[in-house]
Amino acid sequence: MKAMMVVGTTSHAGKSFITTAICRILARRGWHITPFKGQNMALNAYVTTTGGEIGYAQAVQAWAAGINPRVEMNPILLKPQGNMTSQVILGGKAAGITTATNYYEQYFDKGWNMIVHSLERLAVEYDFVVCEGAGSPAEINLKHRDLTNMRVAKYLNAPTLLVVDIDRGGAFAHVVGTLQLLDESERALIKGIVINKFRGQRSLLDSGIEWLENYTGIPVLGVIPWREISFSAEDSLDLLERRRKEQKEINVTILRLPHIANFTDFEPLDAEKTVSISYLDLNEPLGYPDAVIIPGSKTTINDLIALHESGIAKQLQDYVAAGGIVLGICGGFQMLGEMVFDPDQLEGNNVSYAGLNLLPIETVITPEKIVRQRHTCSVYPYPGFPITGYEIHQGVTRSSKSPHQRIKTTNHPLFEDGSLGIVNDNQSVWGCYLHGIFDNGAWRRNWLNYLRNRRGLPSLPTGIANYREQRETVLNQLADLVEQYIDLTPLLNN
């Protein structure tokens, strides 16, 4: 199977960005290609048409390649849960929860076999695979059990691109150090270096590049300038850097939960020119934005406890009582109710926990994980729009059965499938299980218009395309940028 690999000197060097761009570049040239990342650690996940769970970044790369995401593109997904544990997703299915030490004892051989099997299946259908590494390929304490960097490159005999982030400083040292820590057979696969996120005059790098090429014997194939292009972040390090202060017509606050998951849900909101998004730490005052979103969570109960202990829970209750709007998605939806029950103690040491008391519902955490794509139609905020999204959760939510129910309101279904979400009588509290809900353009605009009309602002047009069309524009922008500044010829000719 013909292949190439993209690795980085550090995390966040730009591997995903460049891999995605290369997928789109080659697809535009008519190549029948597929992305691949043997093992990914991320909280942003996507559900394939077969009900398998993969990293969201690999789904984006598949779309860049012009194909549908599938589990073979990311056979191992690790979803951190806190307390040094992660949920292991093998071949798209939850396989268990483990620590880092136990993971390699339990899953190393099984994981490598899964990687090889996935590559063999992809080889049957695709002519070329663009592989992405993880972290750094030169972590000395991890190299012997690294499943996703040079082990994959050597298996495929793939010419490899080494990416370095110069914006952090120390780029030349990062490159030289990484190469020195690779063994000879691994270094032989490195066919080019890319300097990413460069700010300033390109000619100032010339002497450094000349030295680097002479010292390493490896050509610098490109210098990518810093560009403000919206791109799916893989984990919360990027999220922490996204603190938008600019106020716009509609201001939405998203709670930065300790175990936040699937915050890629909010990219379509971020792309709305009249909407300002800010992520709020739980030790900050809530204020009075136009809406507050409680996002998905990898551990609903732990994040619910954090909301209570931080005082945000009480602030949310006061905010709603004063006329504010709250939307909970997935784990955030589960938190909105009166109680969350955990009879098997899957997430905590108790069997019941007080919710936020904003909706007359209760949730029971269950061992079975629901992972599936969904297609339905809207009921609120406007009926009849086709809706697509996906569920990833453990737990069943139902109307509260408490004889002392405190919340005197009626639940109204958000969608024709009432199990997917509800809204209360005065449309101040919304909850849904659907990830990707804002990808649905007409639904997103109608929900935003509801917020706008409350402020006396005119409605925006609702006859707009879904976010996938905007994403296509972004993918083409990424490809244009990389194609302009990187010479891929040495990698493709090999």
UniProtKB/Swiss-Prot annotation:
<comment type="pathway">
    <text>Cofactor biosynthesis; adenosylcobalamin biosynthesis.</text>
</comment>
<comment type="similarity">
    <text>Belongs to the CobB/CobQ family. CobQ subfamily.</text>
</comment>
<dbReference type="InterPro" id="IPR033949">
    <property type="entry name" value="CobQ_GATase1"/>
</dbReference>
<feature type="active site" description="Nucleophile">
    <location>
        <position position="330"/>
    </location>
</feature>
<dbReference type="InterPro" id="IPR047045">
    <property type="entry name" value="CobQ_N"/>
</dbReference>
<dbReference type="Pfam" id="PF01656">
    <property type="entry name" value="CbiA"/>
</dbReference>
<feature type="active site">
    <location>
        <position position="435"/>
    </location>
</feature>
<dbReference type="InterPro" id="IPR029062">
    <property type="entry name" value="Class_I_gatase-like"/>
</dbReference>
<dbReference type="GO" id="GO:0003824">
    <property type="term" value="F:catalytic activity"/>
</dbReference>
<protein>
    <recommendedName>
        <fullName>Cobyric acid synthase</fullName>
    </recommendedName>
</protein>
<dbReference type="GO" id="GO:0015420">
    <property type="term" value="F:ABC-type vitamin B12 transporter activity"/>
</dbReference>
<dbReference type="GO" id="GO:0009236">
    <property type="term" value="P:cobalamin biosynthetic process"/>
</dbReference>
<keyword id="KW-0315">Glutamine amidotransferase</keyword>
<keyword id="KW-0169">Cobalamin biosynthesis</keyword>
<feature type="domain" description="GATase cobBQ-type">
    <location>
        <begin position="249"/>
        <end position="443"/>
    </location>
</feature>
<dbReference type="InterPro" id="IPR011698">
    <property type="entry name" value="GATase_3"/>
</dbReference>
<comment type="function">
    <text>Catalyzes amidations at positions B, D, E, and G on adenosylcobyrinic A,C-diamide. NH(2) groups are provided by glutamine, and one molecule of ATP is hydrogenolyzed for each amidation.</text>
</comment>
<dbReference type="Pfam" id="PF07685">
    <property type="entry name" value="GATase_3"/>
</dbReference>
<dbReference type="InterPro" id="IPR002586">
    <property type="entry name" value="CobQ/CobB/MinD/ParA_Nub-bd_dom"/>
</dbReference>
<dbReference type="InterPro" id="IPR004459">
    <property type="entry name" value="CobQ_synth"/>
</dbReference>
<dbReference type="InterPro" id="IPR027417">
    <property type="entry name" value="P-loop_NTPase"/>
</dbReference>
